[in-house]
UniProtKB/Swiss-Prot annotation:
Organism annotation: African swine fever virus (isolate Warthog/Namibia/Wart80/1980)
GO biological process, one term: regulation of primary metabolic process
Top-level taxon of the source organism: Viruses
Protein name: Protein DP71L
Function: Interacts with the host phosphatase PP1 catalytic subunit (PPP1CB) and recruits it to dephosphorylate EIF2S1/eIF2alpha and therefore restores the host translation that has been shut-down by the host. Also inhibits the EIF2S1/eIF2alpha-ATF4-DDIT3/CHOP pathway.
Length: 71
């Protein structure tokens, strides 16, 4: 039987081996956002903040402009 390979039978016993050192992954590590994604979120937040401040300031600035035009 020197060069022949033994055919694997379907009823052979299979052994499970576990690694001695276990690597643990936290859910936060897996779902952590990349720097490009964090930059996109920051950019979106900044745009929303600008829009909300513009809404507040435009009323005040337009009122002041109208007062100056009346004088």
């Amino acid at each position: 039987m020197g060069g022949r390979r033994r055919k694997k039978r379907t009823n052979d016993v299979k052994h499970v081996r576990f690694a001695a050192a276990v690597e643990v992954w936290e859910a936060d590590d897996i779902e952590r956002k990349g720097p490009w994604e964090q930059a996109a979120v920051d950019r979106f937040r900044f745009q929303r903040r600008i829009a909300s401040v513009e809404e507040l300031l435009s009323a005040v600035l337009l009122r002041q402009k109208k007062l100056l035009e009346q004088q």
